[in-house]
Swiss-Prot record:
GO terms for molecular function: phosphatidylglycerol-prolipoprotein diacylglyceryl transferase activity. Pathway: Protein modification; lipoprotein biosynthesis (diacylglyceryl transfer). This is Phosphatidylglycerol--prolipoprotein diacylglyceryl transferase. Catalyzes the transfer of the diacylglyceryl group from phosphatidylglycerol to the sulfhydryl group of the N-terminal cysteine of a prolipoprotein, the first step in the formation of mature lipoproteins. Signal peptide: none annotated. One of its GO terms (cellular component) is plasma membrane. Its EC number is 2.5.1.145. It comes from Bacillus cereus (strain G9842). Belongs to the Lgt family. A 1,2-diacyl-sn-glycero-3-phospho-(1'-sn-glycerol) binds at residue 138.
Length: 270
């Protein structure tokens, strides 16, 4: 379709009768499946049955989506209080990663306890998968033309040597914007490579997951500063506050668990 004279991508992938299927959902689903493949592959290498992560994903993903939506709605309550019918409409976006992460961690803890396996072992194995899903998922924001940054010129975007389809999609209502989705996606892809490399270092159990939290949070903090659609609490950007909190908590957990002897096992130990 066209917006002005700039060709753009349609956020609807296919129309099934009266029901549109959005790229957003397809991309999120692709991220989940690729992350699951990565986790089951590593899990089998470390003695975790393949169906463990399949079962976990079947439970955790719906709960994570629920928490992600609840988190988003809470901080946009002024709008949703006036439009309650839109609370359950997630086909075009409106999912907060930090909310989803909270839901996933709670589910993971309960799941691990019920299965009699170490939560930290599952979390370490899943860490690269989660970050991979986030890296891919940001392209859903791209298709929806959301989660972008401040206004820029086309010349600025061309100076980044971006392909035309990205530049054109960043043209929204007559204005070009920072492709913050791309910055975060690239940061996350680099993080996946880092986490896969750190597997070979054989960190203490739980520390690969904390490394994921630190890496993601550092990148998110800086990218969030460029965004124009941040969830706010007064003058504070919620994602930046959460990012700082996760970095601090992760470092404290690493130090305390080591001092208390709760991190004696290594990543690859059973």
């Amino acid at each position: 379709m066209l917006l002005g004279s700039v060709p753009q991508l349609d956020r609807v992938a296919v129309q099934l009768g009266p029901f549109p299927v959005y790229w957003y959902g397809i991309i999120i689903g692709t991220g989940v499946l690729l992350g699951l493949w990565l986790a089951t592959r590593e899990g089998e290498r470390l003695g975790i049955p393949k169906d463990t992560f399949v079962d976990l994903v079947l439970i955790a993903v719906p709960i994570a989506i629920l928490f992600a939506r609840m988190y988003y709605v809470i901080f946009e309550w002024e709008y949703y209080a006036q439009n309650p019918s839109q609370i359950i409409n997630i086909r075009q976006g409106g999912l907060a990663i930090h909310g989803g992460l909270i839901g996933a961690v709670i589910t993971g803890i309960l799941f691990a306890k019920r299965r009699g396996v170490s939560f930290w072992k599952l979390a370490d194995i899943a860490a690269p998968s989660i970050l991979l899903g986030q890296a891919i998922g940001r392209w859903g924001n791209f298709m929806n033309q959301e989660a972008h940054g401040d206004e820029v010129t086309r010349q600025f975007l061309e100076g980044l040597h971006l392909p035309d389809f990205i530049i054109n999609q960043m043209y929204i209502e007559g204005v070009y914007y920072h492709p913050t989705f791309l910055y975060e996606s690239l940061w996350n892809f680099v993080g996946v490579i880092l986490l896969l490399a750190l597997r070979k270092v054989n960190l203490r159990r739980g520390e690969l997951f904390f490394t994921y939290l630190i890496w993601y949070s550092v990148g998110r903090f800086f990218v969030e500063g460029l965004r124009t659609d941040s969830l706010m609490l007064g003058p504070l950007r919620i994602a930046q506050v959460m990012s700082i909190g996760l970095v601090v908590i992760s470092i404290i957990f690493i130090i305390v668990r080591r001092k208390m002897g709760q991190a004696d096992k290594r990543y690859s130990e059973n």
